């Protein structure tokens, strides 16, 4: 299909004035009701870790929450930030910090071109965020067990404008596939093959134990 044909088909879709809700993962009303008792769990006990939970929180989050995260991640709690429930907001904060402050190099705003590897199919809101920041997106196809790492490694070796990869290793959105251990190991080593300020943005939700397991 030519570019002209694609643009023609795209215009046909626009002309339909569709208003579709493509949001995924929204809980049903029945599921939302399950969390209602949590509203009363504090029972007027608002002090924790020496902080009044009704007031503005600490920038890095409560120490107790960070220590719990450290246990789950197997790292020092000082390397954990507990901040809100929106991973997309956190990703935006990280990318903006890299743009204006940088890490292991210059601030990204000083580079003529910044690129990110994007496993596809992928999460549309990740792509929208990168597009908004003016970041060039390079597609890396998913293969059923994660992205094509041969291709990803080849790209980062030859193109130093590539400063990161954004991915969802567990139940990837929208395909649902989970990256294999082999792919995860190569993904972890990717920064060593890339530019010194390469950043891996990994959306991974941890499987917490159930009450029965506890």
Question: Where would I find each of the regions flagged by the language model?
Answer:
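N-terminal "arm"/small-domain region of PLP-dependent enzymes with the aminotransferase-like
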Residues: 1-71
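Feature marks short, surface-exposed loop/turn motifs that line or immediately flank catalytic pockets
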Residues: 26-29, 171, 210
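Short, internal active-site loops enriched in acidic
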Residues: 26-28, 86, 206
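Conserved small/polar residues in nucleotide/adenosyl-binding loops
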Residues: 204-210
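Conserved core of the PLP fold type I
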Residues: 51-197, 201
